[in-house]
Amino acid sequence: MSLLSKTRELNTLLQKHKGIAVDFKDVAQTISSVTVTNVFIVSRRGKILGSSLNELLKSQRINEMLESKHIPSEYTELLMDVKQTESNIDIDNELTVFPPEDKEVFSSSRTTVFPILGGGERLGTLVLGRVKDDFNENDLVLGEYAATVIGMEILREKHNEVEKEARDKAAITMAINSLSYSEKEAIEHIFEELGGNEGLLIASKVADRVGITRSVIVNALRKLESAGVIESRSLGMKGTFIKVKKEKFLDELERNK
């Protein structure tokens, strides 16, 4: 397969995800397929965003990493010290992705490390490993292109997260401001009673304890639910199950006391 064909295969995958979050596992599998390598896409804090490995590479240590979705902190630091592409790293180098304890098996292995950059900052690392065969110039061009594309996707996800947080904060503020004094007081007591983000509420019990009518509680919950801040489900005589949908709600409620 030519370099152009391999690049197009990567582009096809990204076009398929246009407008929705990219699955980095899919990206890793595509990179693995077109470069014939083992692939790790790692965040700057060492979280494994996506991977695609040959069964031969899976040792106990590698399996533990995949299960925890994190690489060891020491290896993360080594990767973050790499400022530009380092290619054809051998098994004796501490940057190798292959387990040194299996040195005899991977004596001909080669690792290449591509820093993932975006918006003027380091976002993570793309690590490719081959059991044998050096990385050639085409491999490096493709790897650097893949790292650039991954960086753009990470930035897009970050931007989407910031936008979502802003929308959630606005919805929470509007919902709290829509409550009357007694409704706000009722909500504060409800979440004190629940002691967390979700739980079972018996409205009459809270109403009696606080000295407000049950209708105040019902109206307060209805306002929060219509704003998308909470969800509630009646369980009949058992009470009402309540769950917070926007995670910053309780912090904002506390701040508005």
Curated annotation (Swiss-Prot):
It comes from the Bacteria. It is found in: Cytoplasm. One of its GO terms (cellular component) is cytoplasm. Residues 1-155 are annotated as: GAF domain. InterPro entries: CodY, GAF-like_dom_sf, GTP_trans_reg_CodY_C, Transc_reg_CodY_N, WH-like_DNA-bd_sf, WH_DNA-bd_sf. SUPFAM superfamilies: Winged helix' DNA-binding domain. Pfam families: CodY, HTH_CodY. Residues 203-222 bind DNA. GO terms for biological process: negative regulation of DNA-templated transcription. The keyword Repressor applies. Keywords: Cytoplasm, DNA-binding, Repressor, Transcription, Transcription regulation. GO terms for molecular function: DNA binding; DNA-binding transcription factor activity; GTP binding. Its main location: cytoplasm. DNA-binding global transcriptional regulator which is involved in the adaptive response to starvation and acts by directly or indirectly controlling the expression of numerous genes in response to nutrient availability. During rapid exponential growth, CodY is highly active and represses genes whose products allow adaptation to nutrient depletion. HAMAP family: HTH_type_CodY. Belongs to the CodY family. This is Global transcriptional regulator CodY. It comes from Staphylococcus haemolyticus (strain JCSC1435). The lineage of its organism: Bacteria, Bacillati, Bacillota, Bacilli, Bacillales.
